[in-house]
């Protein structure tokens, strides 16, 4: 961090510590809070140059412990903005949709829906492929609701099964169009 500060660069702080990657809301805010305090108190690191990545993780895996990964990221982004003045939030958008690799349309739609929810709640920047973004207004409502269910609202096995069924339907339709 001293070298980064010496050159006047910003730093991206991943929500990892000695115990590993933060996967829950509580661990994300614990690690980000600790890192912020260390950077500010020990180095007087400019708060606007501290960018946190509170780990956007894969959803719709069928594993119950993954149900809250989408909402936990967004809640952590809100907490960072409310409690760590000046800090910013980033995240890699390919992660939450990884369970749908091979179905690019569903993955790209998930990225759009994720940003629609995460930006107003504190996500300042994202690591993404801009040429693969789908305009928000072109996302079919049924797919938007299914994705929101998996990422933010229902977060259960039924929501996952609904999105998987829609993804398969879309995949088959796209294959038939070829």
Residue ranges of model-derived segments:
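Generic structural signal for well-ordered alpha-helices
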Residues: 1, 29-37, 70-81, 115
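Flexible glycine/proline-rich, aromatic-decorated loop/lid segments
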Residues: 1-12, 86-95, 107
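Conserved anion-binding
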Residues: 1-59
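Hydrophobic faces of well-ordered beta-strands that scaffold small-molecule active sites
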Residues: 11-14, 50-54, 87-93, 124-128
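Active-site beta-loop-alpha junctions enriched in small/polar residues
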Residues: 14-19, 55-62, 92-98, 130-131
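Short glycine/threonine-rich loop-to-helix capping motif typified by GTGT followed
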Residues: 26, 59-72, 100-109
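A structural motif corresponding to the C-terminal end of an alpha-helix
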Residues: 38-47, 79-87, 121-123
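Active-site loops and adjacent core secondary-structure elements that bind or stabilize anionic groups
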Residues: 78, 84, 95-178
């Amino acid at each position: 961090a001293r070298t980064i500060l010496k050159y006047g660069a910003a730093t991206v702080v991943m929500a990892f510590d000695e115990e590993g990657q933060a996967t829950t809301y509580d661990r994300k805010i614990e690690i980000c809070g600790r890192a912020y305090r260390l950077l500010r108190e020990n180095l007087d690191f400019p708060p606007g140059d501290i960018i946190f990545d509170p780990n956007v993780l894969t959803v719709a895996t069928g594993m119950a412990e993954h149900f809250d990964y989408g909402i936990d990221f967004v809640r952590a982004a809100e907490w960072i903005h409310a409690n760590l003045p000046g800090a910013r939030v980033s995240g890699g958008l390919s992660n939450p949709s990884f369970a749908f690799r091979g179905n690019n349309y569903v993955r790209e739609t998930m990225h759009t829906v994720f940003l629609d929810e995460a930006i107003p709640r504190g996500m300042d920047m994202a690591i993404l492929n801009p040429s693969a973004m789908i305009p928000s207004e072109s996302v079919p409502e049924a797919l938007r609701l299914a994705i929101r269910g998996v990422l933010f609202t229902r977060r259960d096995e039924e929501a996952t099964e609904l999105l998987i069924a829609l993804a398969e339907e879309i995949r088959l339709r796209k294959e038939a169009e070829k």
